[in-house]
Swiss-Prot record:
Residues of the PI-PLC X-box domain: 320-464
Taxon lineage: Eukaryota, Metazoa, Chordata, Craniata, Vertebrata
General function of this protein: Mediates the production of the second messenger molecules diacylglycerol (DAG) and inositol 1,4,5-trisphosphate (IP3). Plays an important role in the regulation of intracellular signaling cascades. Becomes activated in response to ligand-mediated activation of receptor-type tyrosine kinases, such as PDGFRA, PDGFRB, EGFR, FGFR1, FGFR2, FGFR3 and FGFR4. Plays a role in actin reorganization and cell migration.
Assembly and interaction partners: Interacts with AGAP2 via its SH3 domain. Interacts (via SH2 domain) with RET. Interacts with FLT1 (tyrosine-phosphorylated). Interacts (via SH2 domain) with FGFR1, FGFR2, FGFR3 and FGFR4 (phosphorylated). Interacts with LAT (phosphorylated) upon TCR activation. Interacts (via SH3 domain) with the Pro-rich domain of TNK1. Associates with BLNK, VAV1, GRB2 and NCK1 in a B-cell antigen receptor-dependent fashion. Interacts with CBLB in activated T-cells; which inhibits phosphorylation. Interacts with SHB. Interacts (via SH3 domain) with the Arg/Gly-rich-flanked Pro-rich domains of KHDRBS1/SAM68.
Record comment regarding domains: The SH3 domain mediates interaction with CLNK. The SH3 domain also mediates interaction with RALGPS1.
Residue ranges constituting the SH2 domain according to the UniProt record: 550-657, 668-756
A biological process term (GO) from this entry: positive regulation of endothelial cell apoptotic process
Record comment: activity regulation: Activated by phosphorylation on tyrosine residues.
UniProt protein name: 1-phosphatidylinositol 4,5-bisphosphate phosphodiesterase gamma-1
Residues found modified as Phosphoserine: S1221, S1227, S1233, S1248, S1263
Annotated segments matching region Disordered: 522-546, 1271-1290
Domain PI-PLC Y-box: 953-1070
Enzyme Commission no: 3.1.4.11
Main location: other
């Protein structure tokens, strides 16, 4: 049974519950039930917990008891609810008799904001209980997503407040509030700032209630954004100041705004405007004939999804557009659908198929290999990716194929199976898919492919087909043999290389081909196991306290320790506003082996003794004799949850007071080291990740000096009171900061790895400093003044795609290597790439490549077509290598072999395996390759040239018959619409260009083509799909699991039609004269100009610890001649409600039928690098005009909660010379606006609608009709053109 969560495409699904039933369901779920939770971790046994729905926040929570919530998920993130034991979490306990729940008592919730969803696997006490949860949650899912924005804000505010107010006391401290605002991307400069903005404090404790918090939020949002250039704001703000609730926007004023500024034709109907306002506000006190907005509510509306720039009317499928042949559509297509991550070690998963199909994907791939018991398995052959059963995949496809869309699904079969297993495949196709499987043509007499409407709810097989009358035979393949295809590798897997600095062994991915050994940069040895990382066992529970921030060790002798503790607590609590119960623990000065708990209460520091004693040889800790703990950590943890009780008070331990000087004993800290001395030390450690921290001369200032990308860099750290600041990231201490960046990248991909001091230099330092790490020179010993810097030619690697804006610029893709770079001032460099010499490119789009290490003899000449692609670190020529096993092992590794090259004196590479068997197999195969390299390559080419096909499988192929691409057949009678061809992106690039693009488009008008990523994209990255789309390729297959720009463009393309997976290509592309790369060939299309101002944003996501400094990049992507991008300035330290200065951006578009408007929000970090925050991408033809919200999505194209931009956008047709037509949409809209203004001015003066006001109303009506006629005529001339000011219904 398919899960619920997405309505069936044909309207089927559970019937909607009645209002009374909904009320009963919500009450029952709010009370909650006890259910058994099955974990995804192998180490955790199933547990019974209380599950409840928190209606105020729209969350599911679970806990052992009533006091503490252990976990929660947002209902808005739920994608699907499945009845039964339909997750792997249940499978782990199949052999355990204690956990064999009835199928009917179980259900699974799938949720998340990424491609790979998380699971909540539950066992209820009865089938009725399961039905209650599924029915209730299904209703709540839809209701939560459809809720008006003010209600969503209310739920979000309560969620933030309750995350701090865990005891539900309806109060939080000012320190909690400051931390909370930081978490939502708003910088609070100091506590005074908060106190000035909060009113009605409870003076006794200084706590803040939810009402005060909500009012503060409303005030912060409005006061920060009242300066935006918006209708109503300028005059009303002058009148009301900081009090937006003193100014009301009436129904009539709001109606005029919708008509005059937004071009909303439906707003002519006053009753519709009234109905909209009531549904948006949902305020019982304003359910009156003349509802109104307060000024801040109007601004909230402008940022809301109800005011989206996207015309939601286009979300519906238009059946009339589904009658063309399949070859006239773009079809949403997935590559290696079964993978959840990279191409060499990730997990193959049934869930990946379900997820893709539910995202509207209509062409999925099955990579089939011979498996056990005569049935194929699916995985990425000859790699470490896990395997799934072919039969299980078919059942998953059957369940999910037509949930999101009823239009046909194409199964692209990559067949590596024997004849016998092919026959079993065919049998299972028929058995499992039944009537949905297409086995005969829709119309034998047709001269083209059938339409999506003709193939509704059908599944098509794409597979090679035999000639008529053959039982089986060898057929030619359309794919050339390549030893660089990882599927053709002789062996691949994880081996280990020793780090020459710390002598630890780190995993690398190795690939052995018929002539070479390739190995990757450091990778993860995890082979895609679905389990979460197992928690590490503590070395000893009695020592757990030593790493806690509240433990300060010995603070001083005698009473000094007491005085120091009192000073630390007093300074911390006064400066930060920390609440009562803030505490630290120190070693007792008086009683050896005991400790002292010092805490803050009512403005004073108090102390109590923590006793210790030995009990049967193990220490015990207690405050009172009747409650004893096994460790100091357990005691403190207990009193953080349960109050300390005495005659005078009850109080929980609340906030730990961090150590301020713990860094002084760390190996990386240097109290008196100059910048020059630090650089000299780091020059002797030629490894990225080497670092130290030094005290600077300025007060309360430090610096981290580190190596990254072969260079030495520095960044400042500032102590501000009790907080340590790195850029705009806050930490409690230097120790916390360093600990964080040992786990997370500090600069690009570099993590702090090797702490450097004199002792470390003696062990790992080189004799000669690497001066090239400090200056741009490459000659050791070459030393120059830092300013001016000499220019040296080097190589750089592209961080992003770049398309030339002028003839003297380079065009390149991400990861391209640009050679002979000459650095120039002004942010532009020159270099060689793609056969072009010394052209310009922006320097911030690239990073300089590090000098090749001595351990990589061929690093300078890396093969860009290697099977490891961008992951490649080194490559060795096997015939030139000698292999020797090291029987004694090396540095705690038992299974080690060495690779040496006689041609390179004194060079060898030590490689470790996980087992003796693995070592022997690698050594054996490498030696075999060394002896037979040339013969093996020839044999591989011969074997791949022809392939045997089973008749039973061939008979299932009706329309999608892959054949080698023959350019000579295009446009001739030999071209058959049932034949199709597949291309790796590298081969497709030979046809999607100015020379052959028009010819390839001609091919695609009749036949299907499928394009897929090149095999070297082992990181599952994607290519740019735009050139393939504009040349008519229908099946542009992408890695759906990868959150990159190509997938975001793919999601945008299929927005129209509600992600049904089929989008009709513009009629222009079916014009024989149309050339995809020549704008002069456009006929029947008017060019248009888009004018955009970015005004502000709300609720931007965070990226790491700091407050973001956002800027917005606006891009038009489409035909090559239309693509361009511009960007705003960045706003300092504000991701909650930033505002940008008014600056119009203009984009001229010649082909608006194939154009996308893309917004990307980046933050600029302390190194001036740009980091992705959010994005939104739309087809230009679906945009609305006026003051519009741009709802933002994450990199997986999932909606971010409440995140949006506010823009002012206008779209108008333009002649070639840029002049406006006198009857253009803009001119007509201006006339309509003038008529609207006159009408409202008359009504405002007189207050009634009498005969003498008939003329202004008639002028308004006529202008609106002219505007509508203008669009109708344009729609007739060019179907589905960009609407300038169409019926923009909310």
């Amino acid at each position: 049974m398919a899960g619920v969560g997405t309505p069936c495409a044909n309207g089927c699904g559970p019937s909607a519950p009645s209002e009374a039933e909904v009320l009963h369901l919500c009450r029952s779920l709010e009370v909650g039930t006890v259910m058994t939770l099955f974990y995804s971790k192998k180490s955790q046994r199933p547990e019974r917990k209380t599950f409840q729905v928190k209606l105020e926040t729209r969350q599911i929570t679970w806990s052992r008891g009533a006091d503490k919530i252990e976990g929660s998920i947002d209902i808005r993130e739920i994608k699907e609810i499945r009845p039964g034991k339909t997750s792997r979490d249940f499978d782990r306990y199949q052999e355990d008799p204690a956990f064999r729940p009835d199928q009917s008592h179980c259900f699974v919730i799938l949720y998340g904001m990424e491609f790979r969803l998380k699971t909540l696997s539950l066992q209820a006490t009865s089938e009725d209980e399961v039905n209650m949860w599924i029915k209730g949650l299904t209703w709540l899912m839809e209701d939560t997503l459809q809720a008006a924005t003010p209600l969503q804000i209310e739920r979000w505010l309560r969620k933030q407040f309750y995350s701090v107010d865990r005891n539900r006391e309806d109060r939080i401290s000012a320190k909690d509030l400051k931390n909370m605002l930081s978490q939502v991307n708003y910088r609070v400069p100091n506590m005074r700032f908060l106190r000035e903005r909060l009113t009605d404090f409870e003076q006794r404790s200084g706590d803040i209630t939810y009402g005060q918090f909500a009012q503060l939020y409303r005030s912060l949002m409005y006061s920060a954004q009242k300066t935006m250039d918006l209708p109503f704001l300028e005059t009303n703000t002058l009148r009301t100041g900081e009090r937006p609730e003193l100014c009301q926007v009436s129904l009539s004023e709001f109606q005029q705004f919708l008509l005059e500024y937004q071009g909303e034709l439906w707003a002519v109907d006053r009753l519709q405007v009234q109905e909209f306002m009531l549904s948006f506000l949902r305020d019982p006190l304003r359910e009156i004939e003349e509802p109104y907005f307060f000024l801040d509510e109007l601004v909230t509306f402008l940022f809301s999804k109800e005011n989206s720039v996207w015309n939601s009317q286009l979300d519906a499928v238009c059946p009339e557009t589904m009658n063309n042949p399949l070859s006239h559509y773009w079809i949403s297509s997935s590559h290696n659908t079964y993978l959840t991550g990279d191409q060499f070690s990730s997990e193959s998963s049934l869930e990946a198929y379900a997820r893709c199909l539910r995202m509207g994907c209509r062409c999925i791939e099955l990579d089939c290999w011979d498996g056990p018991d005569g049935m194929p398995v699916i995985y990425h052959g000859h790699t470490l990716t896990t395997k799934i059963k072919f039969s299980d995949v078919l059942h998953t496809i059957k369940e999910h194929a037509f949930v999101a869309s009823e239009y046909p699904v194409i199964l692209s079969i990559e067949d590596h199976c024997s004849i016998a297993q092919q026959r079993n495949m065919a049998q299972h196709f028929r058995k499992v898919l039944g009537d949905t499987l297409l086995t005969k043509p829709v119309d034998i007499a047709a001269d083209g492919l059938p339409s999506p409407n003709q193939l509704k709810r059908k599944i098509l097989i794409k597979h090679k087909k035999l000639a008529e009358g053959s039982a089986y035979e060898e057929v030619p393949t359309s794919v050339m043999y390549s030893e660089n295809d990882i599927s053709n590798s002789i062996k691949n897997g994880i081996l280990y290389l020793e780090d020459p600095v710390n002598h630890e062994w780190y995993p690398h991915y190795f690939v052995l081909t018929s002539s070479k050994i390739y190995y990757s940069e450091e990778t993860s040895s995890d082979q895609g196991n679905e389990d979460e990382e197992e928690p590490k066992e503590a070395s000893g529970s009695t020592e757990l306290h030593s790493s806690e921030k509240w433990f300060h060790g010995k603070l001083g002798a005698g009473r000094d320790g007491r005085h120091i503790a009192e000073r630390l607590l007093t300074e911390y609590c006064i400066e930060t506003g920390a609440p009562d119960g803030s505490f630290l623990v120190r070693e007792s000065e008086t009683f050896v082996g005991d400790y002292t708990l010092s805490f803050w209460r009512n403005g004073k520091v108090q102390h109590c003794r923590i006793h210790s004693r030995q009990d049967a040889g193990t220490p015990k800790f207690f405050l009172t004799d009747n409650l004893v703990f096994d460790s100091l950590y357990d005691l403190i943890t207990h009193y953080q949850q349960v109050p300390l009780r005495c005659n005078e008070f009850e109080m929980r331990l609340s906030e730990p007071v961090p150590q301020t000087n713990a860094h002084e004993s760390k190996e990386w800290y240097h109290a008196s080291l100059t910048r020059a001395q630090a650089e000299h030390m780091l020059m002797r450690v030629p490894r990225d990740g080497a670092f130290l921290v030094r005290k600077r001369n300025e007060p309360n200032s430090y610096a981290i000096s580190f190596r990254a990308e072969g260079k030495i860099k520095h960044c400042r750290v500032q102590q501000e009171g009790q907080t340590v600041m790195l850029g705009n990231s806050e930490f409690d201490s230097l120790v916390d900061l360093i600990s964080y960046y040992e786990k997370h990248p500090l600069y690009r991909k570099m993590k702090l790895r090797y702490p450097i001091n004199e002792e470390a230099l003696e062990k790992i330092g080189t004799a000669e400093p690497d001066y090239g790490a400090l200056y741009e020179g490459r000659n050791p010993g070459f030393y120059v003044e830092a300013n001016p810097m000499p220019t040296f030619k080097c190589a750089v690697k592209a961080l992003f795609d770049y398309k030339a804006q002028r003839e003297d610029e380079l065009t390149f893709t991400k990861s391209a290597i640009i050679q002979n770079v000459e650095k120039q001032d002004g942010g532009w460099w020159r270099g060689d790439y793609g056969g072009k010499k010394q052209l310009w490119f922006p320097s911030n789009y690239v990073e300089e490549m590090i000098n090749p290490a001595i351990l990589e003899p061929e690093r300078e000449h890396l093969d860009e077509n290697s099977p490891l692609g961008d992951l490649l670190r080194g490559v060795l020529d096997v015939p030139a290598c000698q292999i020797a096993i090291r029987p004694e092992g090396k540095n705690n590794r038992l299974f080690v072999f060495s690779i040496s090259m006689p041609s390179v004196a004194q060079w060898s590479l030590d490689v470790a395996a996980d087992s003796q068997e693995e070592l022997q197999d690698w050594v054996k195969k490498i030696r075999e390759v060394a002896q037979t390299a040339d013969a093996r390559l020839t044999e591989g080419k011969m074997m791949e040239r022809r392939k045997k096909i089973a008749l039973e499988l061939s008979e299932l192929v009706v329309y999608c018959r892959p054949v080698p691409f023959d350019e000579e057949k295009i446009g001739t009678e030999r071209a058959c619409y049932r034949d199709m061809s597949s291309f790796p992106e590298t081969k497709a690039e030979k046809y999607v260009n100015k020379a052959k693009g028009k010819k390839f488009l001609q091919y695609n008008r009749l036949q299907l083509s499928r394009i897929y990523p090149k095999g070297q994209r082992l990181d599952s990255s994607n290519y740019d799909p735009l050139p393939m789309w504009i040349c008519g390729s229908q099946l542009v297959a992408l890695n759906f699991q990868t959150p990159d720009k190509p997938m975001q463009m793919n999601q945008a393309l299929f927005m129209a039609g509600g992600h049904c997976g089929y989008v009709l290509q513009p009629s222009t592309m079916r014009d024989e004269a149309f050339d995809p790369f020549d704008k002069s060939s456009l006929r029947g299309l008017e060019p248009c100009v888009i004018c955009i101002e970015v005004l502000g944003a709300r609720h931007l996501p965070k990226n790491g610890r700091g407050i973001v400094c956002p800027f917005v990049e606006i891009e038009v992507a489409g035909a090559e001649y239309d693509s361009t991008k511009q960007k705003t300035e960045f706003v300092v330290d504000n991701g909650l409600n930033p505002v940008w200065p008014a600056k119009p951006f203009h984009f001229q578009i010649s082909n608006p039928e194939f154009a996308f408007l893309r917004f990307v929000v980046y933050e600029e970090d302390m190194f001036s690098d740009q980091n992705f925050l959010a994005q939104a991408t739309f087809p230009v033809k679906g945009l609305k005009t006026g003051y519009r919200a741009v709802p933002l999505k994450n990199n997986y194209s999932e909606d971010l909660e409440l995140a949006s931009l506010l823009i002012k956008i206008d779209i108008f047709p333009a002649k070639e010379n840029g002049d406006l037509s006198p009857f253009s949409g803009t001119s007509l809209r201006e006339r309509a606006s003038d008529a609207s203004s006159q009408l409202f001015h008359v009504r405002a003066r007189e207050g009634s609608f009498e005969a003498r006001y008939q003329q202004p109303f008639e002028d308004f009506r006529i202008s609106q009709e002219h505007l509508a006629d203008h669009f109708d005529s344009r729609e007739r001339r060019a179907p589905r053109r960009t609407r300038v000011n169409g019926d923009n219904r909310l």
